[in-house]
Amino acid sequence: VYFGRLKGLSKIDTKKRSEDFLKQVGLTDKANLRLDKLSGGEQQKIQLGITIINNPDILILDEPTKGFDPVNRRLLMNIIEEHQKAGATVIFVTHQMEEVERLCDRAILLKDGTAYAYGTIAEIKEKFGGASLDDIFIKVYGDENNAEEKL
């Protein structure tokens, strides 16, 4: 509730949005616990809730689904996608190419601070001969069998 108030929401609106979010991510039974009593994944869900409580125009997220199982990854991506469809611009860092395919209009592939590709998903795939984003990722970053391979 504190963060909603901090972001200018009324106490009633903050309480409702907080309750709705906790229900959406399956944490209603943890509503009265201190953050340090939650697991890492639960804390990460709460951090997303704090980020989106006031429906910002821009969401900047750093690996929002890192460490989650497929069920919770999909849940969080659904929440992020809802905000995107409501008009929010979403900028995020991820190593999950299916998340890029699902949410991104444009993408930048970076390695060591250098942009290797930028454009729509179709443009990036075309640049790399129609390969899947996973294959492009492996080509750009290498794989465990050939870590020295460079573009």
Q: Where are each of the predicted segments found?
A:
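A short, surface-exposed alpha-helical micro-motif characterized by mixed small hydrophobic
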Residues: 100-102
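ABC ATPase "signature
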Residues: 118-119
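Helical segment within the ABC ATPase nucleotide-binding domain
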Residues: 74-86
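Conserved ABC ATPase "signature" region
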Residues: 1, 5, 10-30
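Catalytic Walker B motif of ABC-type/P-loop ATPase nucleotide-binding domains
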Residues: 59-62
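Conserved ABC ATPase signature
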Residues: 34-38
